[in-house]
């Protein structure tokens, strides 16, 4: 952690996270222009999935700007749209309970991934080699695309079009 390469990589990650944040803000401005919430949410997830998967193929640090801009699109949509879509799919009673359970479906996978992700990645790594973390990014991209398809399983009952 004291090597020059490590410090340069850490600095570059900070730049990429800033690019992701900029992409998120710009996409958040665009989201209200779309009337169909499920469509824009699914599109955002697909764009984020493409961003994550593209990191596998990109070998130029500056081209990663495009990848992280796309990841920012998914991030912007994930902050608000799932709860809006869910509340529109529920009728009044027990809404707090459902929202709490829904929040658990977000938090529990994050905790499991943080606790076990490295171990799972190591299972697919040859003995004596470092695990290829890029596989986790590709997996994240695939999961976002699967999630985009699942968006259409939810039927909003009120306010279908904003």
Where are these regions (language model features)?
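Multi-pass alpha-helical transporter architecture, strongest
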Residues: 136-162
């Amino acid at each position: 952690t004291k090597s020059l390469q490590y410090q340069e990589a850490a600095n570059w990650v900070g730049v990429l996270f800033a690019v992701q944040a900029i992409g998120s803000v710009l996409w958040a401005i665009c989201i209200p222009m779309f009337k169909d919430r499920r469509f824009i949410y699914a599109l955002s997830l697909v764009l984020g999935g493409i961003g994550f998967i593209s990191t596998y193929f990109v070998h130029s640090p500056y081209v990663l700007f495009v990848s992280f801009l796309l990841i920012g699109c998914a991030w912007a949509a994930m902050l608000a749209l799932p709860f809006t879509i869910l509340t529109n799919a529920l009728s009044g009673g027990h809404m707090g309970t459902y929202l709490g359970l829904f929040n658990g479906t977000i938090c529990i996978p994050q905790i499991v991934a943080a606790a076990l992700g490295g171990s799972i990645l190591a299972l697919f790594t040859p003995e004596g080699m470092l695990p290829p973390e890029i596989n986790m990014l590709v997996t994240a991209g695939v999961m976002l695309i699967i999630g985009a398809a699942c968006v259409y399983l939810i039927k909003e009952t009120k306010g279908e079009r904003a």
